[in-house]
Amino acid sequence: MPAFPLPDQCQFIDRPSPTTAAEVMHDMDGRVDMVIDGGPCHIGVESTIVECSGDDKVTILRPGGVTIEMLKEIVPVVEMDTTLVTGKGVPKAPGMKYRHYAPSAPMTVVVGTEDKVTAKLQSLYEGLKAEGKTVGFLVSEEVGSHFPHKNMYVWGHHDDKEALANQLYTGLLSFDSDVVDVILAEGVDDEGLGLAIMNRMKKAAGGHVILVD
């Protein structure tokens, strides 16, 4: 057995989190003696980090699989840390201070209705193609049907946030293998699980998010 077992979701801080044993082995090959495969992460954007202030209040420092709506069922007062709302100040939670969960290629995230996201991605794609860039797409089935299928990772249907949360990191890691110059990604609204998804996507994109509603 290895002398020092690794925790789940072990990773390098500047890389997307591995959510399968194969992805852990890819990152840790040559650094560890063994990887025990307990199956893929169930949610994908796993941990919600909160600060507890007495019995009746929690402050969300990093959104995750446990959503605001879930917390409100058991805690009277649930607030967001001001750094999440304003984007200013020093975040308290790990992984919130710098560009994090990031693929090798720069990424732009587009958020809005299906039609407007498709149109904006098409415009961005045409410009990048004219520059000779190789583009990767992280999109839903509906939006993906409008683009070449090479270098594309499709997570599922447009409104399936659970599928995107589950496959986000696997999708980002796939582009490191495909060697793309730029990643164009379809985001979601920040309701429910969407809050955690967009938190991770914004970090991966270095804040480069375009709203087209």
Name every feature range the model reports, one short phrase each.
Residues 1-213:
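Active-site-adjacent structural elements in enzyme catalytic cores
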